[in-house]
Amino acid sequence: MGEIAPEMEISQYTKDKASCTRISIESYYSKRVTQCAERENRLKKLEEDISARGLSDEEKEEKRKIHHSKETDYLRLKRTRLTVNDFESLKVIGRGAFGEVRLVQKHDTGHIYAMKILRKSEMVEKEQTAHVRAERDILSEADCDWVVKMYYSFQDYSNLYLVMEFLPGGDMMTLLIKKDTLTEEATQFYIAEAALAIQFIHSLGFIHRDIKPDNLLLDARGHVKLSDFGLCTGLKKFHRTDHYRNWPSTLPPDFISKPFESKRKAETWKRNRRAYAYSTVGTPDYIAPEVFQPNGYTKSCDWWSLGVIMYEMLIGYPPFCSELPQETYRKVINWQQTLVFPSDVPISIEAKATIKRFCCEAERRLGNHGGLDEIKQCPFVKRIDWNHIRERPPPIRVTVKSIDDTSNFDDFPDEDLTWPTSTLIRPEEQPGRRGEFVDFTYKRFDGLTQKMRYSDLKKFQQAKKNKKGGQQGTSD
């Protein structure tokens, strides 16, 4: 009788390869089902559009031929591998703890995008892989005017790339820094649009958890779009709140009694605001108190954040802002004592009542039980035309001079616009080889079939030519 062979010890490398293979196979079949459903939906929308227009048989057939041609192009283009060399880097428009955002132009279509570039090594080291995966998954699923649209996602050995629509209006943080405070009419408009965006995310089954002015982007007309979904629920680790949990939450005896003039407080807040936006930890100003607690939270935490933003729009700074994030954290935890309204910045009774209904206990918070329908009944926003708000002109006009206008963004002077030399890294040195970034690639149907209007492309090319000519003339 032969001896039983001892069990072979499986190496970590083999386990990682097996895990990646399993994820790839599962993803492949899941994507096949999803793509089939999406194709059927596009055909259904086409037929509905054809029926609504009352076209002749010849016109209907022509529409169907164009659609089938697009579907064929889409299948072919999906097989092509995207790299950074398919884009021209124009300008750095944002920088964060883990990467940067660039204004780019796609070579074959001439279309302008905002490209978020994230370093894989930083993602793995700082345990942010689940966050970027969440953002990629939600942006690929979301197809709505209230959410920033992602057209492509891809990766190379060093970096992850999210290619999104460029929104030249900037963000709400920049607008608030410029304007100090907003009128109640303007506040009603922006709070209503933000509420519609939040409700859409909730309808997908997600909680955003990071609602703040930085993440409320403005399109070319000045309408709101929600962005940055890296902290949506479904994740087991919430990096930012973990950072605060070891801090003391009790207030010193004289903590609230210190007088602080509103104008001076607003100036201090503005001075520190951008530094918070670009830091790893950020600021706890907009985070609901229950998110810091171990007992859990619900989607109502997003409505708390909206109440804090509303306060900032009307008063000029968030209700719990302090010189140090530790102090802000203590104020948020003890909101019953620290949520006060300054006497030198008068606001209406309706506005104050709405803020108090957003910033209160989770179980009785505005929006907690009835969602958007409950918020619509609030006196402060009852005059809003909710069904047609996106067709209406925003209260504050956004100035956009060209398709690549970045005047509503911060300047990042003397930045190197060359692409990272990621291809020099060998595959075996690739960060995150245990399946973190498997199946990261995404291509949107209307992104692959759209072209820039010829007139816009010619204007853009002429503007670039003039700019280069001016720079050469200066150097001569």
UniProtKB/Swiss-Prot annotation:
The UniProt record lists the keyword Transmembrane helix: no
Give the EC number: 2.7.11.1
**Expression sites by tissue:** Widely expressed in embryonic and larval neurons that contribute axons to the nerve ring and in hypodermal cells, including lateral seam cells. Also displays a punctate localization in muscle.
The reactions it catalyses are:
L-seryl-[protein] + ATP = O-phospho-L-seryl-[protein] + ADP + H(+); L-threonyl-[protein] + ATP = O-phospho-L-threonyl-[protein] + ADP + H(+)
Q: Which segments constitute the AGC-kinase C-terminal domain?
A: 382-452
Keywords recorded for this protein, A-Z:
ATP-binding, Cytoplasm, Developmental protein, Kinase, Magnesium, Metal-binding, Neurogenesis, Nucleotide-binding, Nucleus, Phosphoprotein, Serine/threonine-protein kinase, Transferase
Q: Which residues form the Protein kinase domain?
A: 87-381
The name under which this protein is listed is Serine/threonine-protein kinase sax-1
Give the source species: Caenorhabditis elegans
Q: Which gene encodes it?
A: sax-1
